[in-house]
Amino acid sequence: DSTEATQAAQETESPTPYPELLDMLEAYNRELYEDDQSKLSSLAATEQPGVLFSVSGQAGDVFGVLSIPKLDLEMPLYLGATDKHMADGAAQLGQTSIPIGGENTNAVIAGHRGYNGAPYFRYVPELQIGDSVDITNLWGTLHYKVVETRIIQPNDIDAIKIQPGRDLITLLTCHPYASGGRQRVLVICERMEEENGR
């Protein structure tokens, strides 16, 4: 009967992995928002992760995977935009939200505009409004859609701050590609509505 089916479904639901880590990351994101990202004084301040991810025991400290289906792009995602992380994949800027989703978050994810023959974020500025960008982490896959593209100066910190009430990721890379990238291009993506549960 339906009672037995419900009970069986509840028994097969697996518990949330790494619950203490998730609590810590959610608390970090909340504090970042409540503090108005006061330590985000320049893009140089974004190299170090606000949270050390090694506590999870994940190999190489990879936090997750960034996927952009339109570009057939999948990259490892790290916390903190250090030179090593940027060489190995995409990196969340320190002093911006950890990419776990949730209201009042904006995880800014940087990538080189091509590196050692690999495209990395070379074609990210070509994304159009409505294109999908996904992040898979220890707790599942978060689905976002591109809502805006913007070109900024490297010192325009306000452009990458959390926007109240929204669940965002912002892809960031150098612009223009051909002339050494003196500016930055932002591709702002918002979480798909049906998934704003966390």
Feature map (PLM): residue ranges:
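Solvent-exposed, non-transmembrane regions of membrane-associated and secreted proteins
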Residues: 1-198
